[in-house]
């Protein structure tokens, strides 16, 4: 059996690593970032503090937050318009699955002339993309469940058909991911439980998939072990 493995995403892990957002932007030569997060997170004190720190480093921080869970194509279009209006050169995608998916899609679509649905994960549709103008992405997840921060796709709903589509391109993959456990502490017990079960489901799916590789199984089993060990405590104590 022949397989290829790579882990191209740079992961910055640890408590309060979110304070390194400015450094992450500098590493990617981002001078005018678009901060993308959903309307439920934008007014939280911790998010306001992060934006305030970014404002100390950049002349201006442009924010796009006009979306909630299960984003639609029009949300991405509006975000792309904001990206171009303010002449941004990179995206900070902040939040749970929706914030990450929308941020990644905005960075990707900012360099495209086709509709987003032309890049659905079907065959070689991804080869239609203009790869030269895809903006760099920094992902900052606030939940443990989706894994979107290391994924090459976004889940976006087509509002006309009411069907959720998977939009794919290798460059959907963020260049830097900041994994700061402090950002998960304010989640409600219900959301902590739901995203924890999502993480468990991803690991079970990987372990039970027909294709086998010992590295994948090892990662999946360790993920299951960690979920069993810590999820109940996280739900109870944050």
Label for each model-derived stretch:
Residues 1-90:
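ATP/NTP phosphate-donor binding region
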Residues 9, 37, 142-146, 150, ...:
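Ser/Thr-centric signal marking residues that sit
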Residues 10-13, 42, 68-71, 98, ...:
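Catalytic cores of large soluble enzymes that bind and process phosphate-bearing ligands
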Residues 19, 98, 144-146, 185, ...:
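Glycine-rich nucleotide phosphate-binding loop and flanking beta-alpha elements
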Residues 22, 51, 62, 77-80, ...:
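Predominant activation on well-ordered alpha-helical scaffold segments within soluble catalytic domains
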Residues 55-60, 114, 233-238:
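Short, glycine- and charge-enriched coil/turn segments that flank and shape catalytic ligand pockets
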Residues 74-181:
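Glycine/threonine-rich beta-strand-loop-alpha-helix active-site module
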Residues 153-238:
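Carboxylate- and glycine-rich phosphate/diphosphate-binding segment that chelates Mg2+/Mn2+
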């Amino acid at each position: 059996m022949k397989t290829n493995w790579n882990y191209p995403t740079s992961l910055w892990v640890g408590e309060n690593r979110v304070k390194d957002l400015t450094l992450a932007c500098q590493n990617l030569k981002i001078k005018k970032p678009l901060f993308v997060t959903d309307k439920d997170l934008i007014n939280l004190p911790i998010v306001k503090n992060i934006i305030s720190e970014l404002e100390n480093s950049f002349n201006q921080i442009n924010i796009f937050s006009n979306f909630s869970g299960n984003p639609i194509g029009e949300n991405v279009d509006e975000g792309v318009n904001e990206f171009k209006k303010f002449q941004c050169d990179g995206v900070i995608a902040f939040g749970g699955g929706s914030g990450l998916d929308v941020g990644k899609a905005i960075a990707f679509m900012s360099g495209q002339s086709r509709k987003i649905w032309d890049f659905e994960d079907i065959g070689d549709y991804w080869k239609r993309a203009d790869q030269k103008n895809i903006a760099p992405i920094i992902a900052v997840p606030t939940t443990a469940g989706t894994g979107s921060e290391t994924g090459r796709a976004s889940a976006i709903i087509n509002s006309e058909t009411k069907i959720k589509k998977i939009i794919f391109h290798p460059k959907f993959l963020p260049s830097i991911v900041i994994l700061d456990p402090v950002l998960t502490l304010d989640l409600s017990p219900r959301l902590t439980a739901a995203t924890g079960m999502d993480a468990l489901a991803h690991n079970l799916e990987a372990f039970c998939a027909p294709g086998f590789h010992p590295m994948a199984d090892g990662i999946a089993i360790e993920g299951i072990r960690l979920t069993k060990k810590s999820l109940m405590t996280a739900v109870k104590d944050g």
